[in-house]
Amino acid sequence: MNIYLRQNSFLVPDFIAVQRNSFSQFLESGLIQEISKRNPITNSTKELELCFYPQYYKLSPPELNAKQSILKNKTYSCRLYIPVKLTNKRTKTLKLQWVVLGNLPLMTKRGHFIINGSPRVIINQMVRSPGVYFKEVSHADQKLTYYADLIAYRGAWLRIELDKKADIWARMKKTPKLPMLILLQALGLNLPTILKSLNYPKFFENLGHDGNFMKQLKKGRVSSRSSSQELSGSFNLSEDVSLRLDDSSKNMGAENVQRAPLQKSTKKATLFGDFSRSSVYCKTQEEALWALYALTHPLKNPDEVTANLGKSFLYRKFMNSRVYDLSPLGRLRLNQKLNLSVNENITTITAQDLLFITNTLINLNYGVGKVDDIDNLKNRRIRTAGELVQNQFGIGLLRLEKIIREKLKQQQTKLSIGSLINTKPINGALREFFGSSPLSQFMDQTNPLAEITHKRRLSSLGPGGVNRETAGMAIRGIHPTHYGRICPIETPEGQNAGLVNSLTIYSRVNPYGFIETPFYKVVKGQVQNSTRPIFFSAYQEEKKLLAPGDIYANKLKYLPKSELPIRKLAEFTRTTREKIDYISVSPLQMISIATSLIPFLEHDDANRALMGSNMQRQAVPLMTAEAPVVGTGLECRVASDSGHVLQAKKSGFVTYSSAEKITILSPVDSTPAVPKLSKGNNSPQHFHESVGGSCKESQSLQAAAEGYLSGVASSSSSKFTGSSFSTISALNDGVLRRALTQKVLTTGTNCSSMLKNQRFFVEPKAQLYTGAQTPVGRVETILQPNHAEGYLSEVETIQQTQNKLPLQVRFGVEAPKSSFDSEATKISSTLNSIPQHPVLGEDSPSKQVGWALKDPQIQTMLKPKWHHSAQTMSRENWYQNLKGQNVKTFTQVESGRLVTKPTNTKMPMSSLAGTANSKKTGEALYKLASSESATKSMDFSTKTQLKPITYELQKLFRSNQDTSIMHRPVVREGEWVNRGDLLADNSTTVGGELSLGKNLLLAYMPWEGYNFEDAILISERLVSDDAYTSLHIERYEVEIRETKFGLEQITSQIPDEGKLSHLDHFGIAKPGTWVEEGDILIGKVAPMPQKNLSRYEKLLYDVVGKKISTTRDTSLRVPRGVSGRVIHVEILNAENLPPEFVFEGPSRVNLYIAEKRKIHVGDKMAGRHGNKGIISNILPRQDMPYLPDGTPLDMVLNPLGVPSRMNVGQIYECLLGLAGRYLGQKFKVRPFDEIYGPQTSRSLVYSKLYEARLRTGQRWLFNPASPGKTRLFDGRTGECFSQPVTVGQAYMLKLIHLVDEKIHARSIGPYSLVTQQPLRGRSKHGGQRLGEMEVWALEGFGAAYTLQELLTVKSDDIKGREQVMESIQKNKTISLGTPESFKVLIRELQSLCLDVGVYAVDGSGKIKQVDTMKLP
């Protein structure tokens, strides 16, 4: 049951849309843009020209589908074809040809890529938006200086800075700084124009120019104002160059010195240091260009510097659109920041840009204006997967262009397009990106939540981003603009904290890459939630007064009169409702998907909520999934959007259902094509087509299918708030009869789901009519009545003349809907769902529609006497129950898969009044408000053709993390399903609801120290009932290699091996075989050199009758501790073998083993509130504490884990879960429920516990003296514990940190070469290592001998290791040696030139130095 009704219903965007939309954008426009940038490619003489036509490109269908690509270790990709034209202007010839540019990896429907058989995700990168940013620097003397960074989308960065002396400079990478005036003049601005454009022209009051300046510059003189005799920014010179300061002894101390000329003794090199004043300027642009090049190239001979060199330098750096690109966004941001009106198509730097940046910097110096906050989201944008792939594709094209230009240089007489274009550059660039980029990550497939979170992740790391070592707290922190855009809770622990984030539920990324979040307009204190919400980026919301989403609005949608909390910019204040501009659409708006799955989130500390969010992603899918009793309502959306559950693409009749496939018979759609709509989830969408006319948004549309009732009885009398409606729903007879007798027929949650087999009849005189009109908001498909849809659909004729039942037709596409717990929720969900974006709340956007009776005399209604269930009815029962009824029947003709509809079968029935005669042909009339109408005839006597749609189910499929992915069918043969209905569950869903753990009965109490420090005590029931048993699928790979003596071979002929019955003729274990430790999985032999046997050995072989072995066994065997069943074998071709090798049998084999893992001591478990722990003991169920009704507990947790962690939400959850256990109810509790009043959570929990006490008669369930606590009994003694204990039912998860993968033992293994200590880690077969804290612990216990043993012979005492065994065997005392690490330490100190040695005292008392390497 849903506890709290949402006030505002708003569509939740598709969770994977950020990935799919970006790649779709790349295919539609990005790819064309990148190729157009390199178009055309010419040689130096412009005679040869290669031109692409990117708008006509084509993609070939992939050779393998996504599943086959994973099994065969291939990339899921397609070939990119493009027409290319080669023009030779000298010979006036032209060639046109389609060529392959390369293989383009494709994104799957679920939003990831498959590279070399591994699913990978391109995560979204958060970078600084192109534009200009003004910052300030505080110096030690409390003086502030300012600088501006001009960041381009692609190209060199430019910094313009003001120093302490109020000089203004321009800096570029790898070049000395230069005066800003020279740069502005080089761009074509003269001095009067510059000064007129400045708000404070007096900034350059000391501006001066004398005629000797250029002469001195050309002679190699520099100006310096430094009181020191050294030049600032001087360079090291070669020996044959010497510089001296003229008159330095006279002038260096003077303050008025502007220039000190330098004389050089040779002309071989020229040195320019920093100019002391940036106010140096030139008379002409030519001089400025000369000075610009001379200053940026200080080692260049002045005689070789020309103004053209300066011009080409400027063009190369900032004016060439192929090299420097601000992007349209960067131009837009520059125009906004500097109040410019430069055309958006100009994406290079203009003189106007730099002039106004200089003006802004000078204004800041005078205290006018403010600096930018780089952490504000208006200054940061998202580079989505499509954009990252587009950039990498552009790099590949750049490489291709270089190759083509090189080939065009070679004057070949016969140039062909095929010889010019090679697929390697683009393939290589894409392979680099997908294989090695930090933004291309191995997809986290532990469960659907982990997958969907991984695809919505935002990273500030990667190329063009920040470095985790140097990132400070400012960039990691939470900014006010993160509200509704970036989750403040979900982020990793450790060094990536704050650098890797998640998108919130409602956020979306706009075309520019900025994150937007929705708000409702507030007019005079009233929330306008019936209109479409408005999406704001951080820049757009700056001047708005925004209220949070957890403010309660009354039934008239008015906010409270008291002062309300609001946010404007970064300030949080309070104000009255009349001043509020906008309000958030939901309290959940500020958190991410994983965080929104935590019930009672508002009662948890943020640090623990972070852990809870992260640990849900680590939950292992269990063999028997169980939905949570206490959820938040978003579980279905996560399962649905992840793409793991199977949903019906079209409505139809289930003809076959098994664990392998489901077949649905659907009617062939003969309706007109759906009009193409404009893109964007919330952009205005209108009718582009309609039957017989068009309709604008402002017009009203009324549609009546006169004469027929098509099983439709609901529509909307208000505007659509987000999209069109879902599956057409019919009334069952009871609701209809009740509604008709009450003279008003309403929709909403009263309406039942569609029962295709129910028919009703009314008296001929009775006539229904409707006066409701439906204003069209945004409609996603053409208007059409649901005539003759599906196997069980049938249109009943009510009357012919005035006795017609007009019908308000519902229009729209059906939405994918995941699952339903009961008929009631299915009814509600069917009526309330919205296409693409199912409604989060329970308040449906469809309002009531009035159906009135013109003639209320209803004499008889036919009430069918058969039992029905929502939307499902087996065909057999349906036919049996129709016998004797005065209704139409129809039969199925299997040949051709057609359905025919014969005439009425009339049989006497006394309880039925007169019914209308049937009519074979009817008319469906569409009426528009503009009086345009069209009549469409439909002949219902024709046959409806049906088409089977087959859905393949995944069966024990391996994920990236070795967990199992499998489908379980939930529909049976004979059922009718509508589009979007659930067909098959995943291994982590129940009824389409995400189910990652189990509901366990637990208590918070200490138990014999077994739950000390977060340890967990569990019942043996969880092991015996396989409650936490999970399936894991391991992949084993074998590939034959070439050895020194020949080629290996996969075969069943294995020498000296008897147990081979489970192998096939190739020597590979058969699918379905149970294998255990040591069994052969794949038989493989390697050739061996021939042995030179003596005559006696040969005779022995002859006597025994055994052949001399020429091969040795190198078979793949089941590893230690593993046992399972072989579920799949994939035979592949080896890629690294030369083609000339000829061999028998397969060359490469992948074998999959499914293994069951029960829960063990050492496994990690966790709740949803960050309460985690390791299982310390498994008790027999009879020893576990038990409740007053005799029920033993499943788990015992430490009560001290709650107060200090401040995650009290787990207490609310377990108490409400206990109430749900005894009431048989499930709860969906939205976080932040204090909107309904103070202590709402506590009131809910107590009221439900009290209700459970009343219903069950169990008085211990709610004790007012100690609510939530009860008396427990010790299972060992039967005695009652002295104190009441908090008992409840919580949802606990088993995490992927399994002890089976971590437990490790070593007797003999590898040692480190330097320290001679055992290696670290299970993967390297490492051993025990003692660190500082371990040594302290042993010292604290006084275990001196144990400590010495661990630090010497068990660690790195080489000689001691060899002597221990001998000493034990001969009963000698064990000698004490020197650890190798001590010798390494001495040698390291000696290598640092420190005189460190080891000394010993001999018998005579003398001190002798001992050689370190000869220490015992």
Curated annotation (Swiss-Prot):
It catalyses: RNA(n) + a ribonucleoside 5'-triphosphate = RNA(n+1) + diphosphate. It is an enzyme of class 2 (transferase). InterPro entries: DNA-dir_RNA_pol_bsu_ext_1_sf, DNA-dir_RNA_pol_bsu_external_1, DNA-dir_RNA_pol_su2, DNA-dir_RNAP_su2_dom, DNA-dir_RNAP_su2_hyb_sf, RNA_pol_bsu_bac, RNA_pol_bsu_CS, RNA_pol_bsu_protrusion. Keywords: Chloroplast, DNA-directed RNA polymerase, Nucleotidyltransferase, Plastid, Transcription, Transferase. One of its GO terms (biological process) is DNA-templated transcription. One of its GO terms (cellular component) is mitochondrion. It comes from the Eukaryota. Its EC number is 2.7.7.6. GO terms for molecular function: DNA binding; DNA-directed RNA polymerase activity; ribonucleoside binding. It is found in: Plastid, Chloroplast. DNA-dependent RNA polymerase catalyzes the transcription of DNA into RNA using the four ribonucleoside triphosphates as substrates. In plastids the minimal PEP RNA polymerase catalytic core is composed of four subunits: alpha, beta, beta', and beta''. When a (nuclear-encoded) sigma factor is associated with the core the holoenzyme is formed, which can initiate transcription. Belongs to the RNA polymerase beta chain family. This is DNA-directed RNA polymerase subunit beta.
